[in-house]
């Protein structure tokens, strides 16, 4: 498995039994043989912080600092994860949950394999901010569970002070989340209020 190196693995369990494992930075080797097409259910308990140094290791630092090559209209920053009381953002690139395929391939940066997975995420949060992730959400007290009907290559998590604009077209809900006080776009959609559902269809 691969996991952010700043996250400390406290135990790896199978059927209630602790398994031996070895940790080498982001690599976790579990001492449990597995046969071809065999299925195992493991519980990996971990805690800690997020190291952003593990993100996009295939991109050279000088490429980020090069201001003479007009790759895009703006410069990229060097922040890839946020964990604070006011804003949280975790993306698959920071390996905030265990994965079986490394997020980068230094030998062939454009040939990165993806492992599509049936993700279910439960977040325990008692604050007043909005919790978002991929999938359909269900709130049960302080727990918010996100379930997905299809396999995904990865999931993200964000918690922030968001406002929401929503529109239902037929049986599909469309939602836009934005930081409170940053609604600079709604006025441009007012002339389309009657025709927007038809445009979406």
What are these regions (language model features)?
Residues 36-42, 149-162:
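C-terminal beta-strand-rich structural cap/linker in extracellular carbohydrate-active enzymes
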Residues 45-156:
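Extended, low-hydrophobicity, Ser/Thr/Pro/Gly-biased non-transmembrane segments
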Residues 12-13, 131, 167:
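Short aromatic-centered micro-motifs
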Residues 121, 167-201:
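Juxtacatalytic substrate-recognition/specificity segment
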Residues 2, 11-13, 120-122:
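Beta-strand signatures of extracellular beta-sandwich domains
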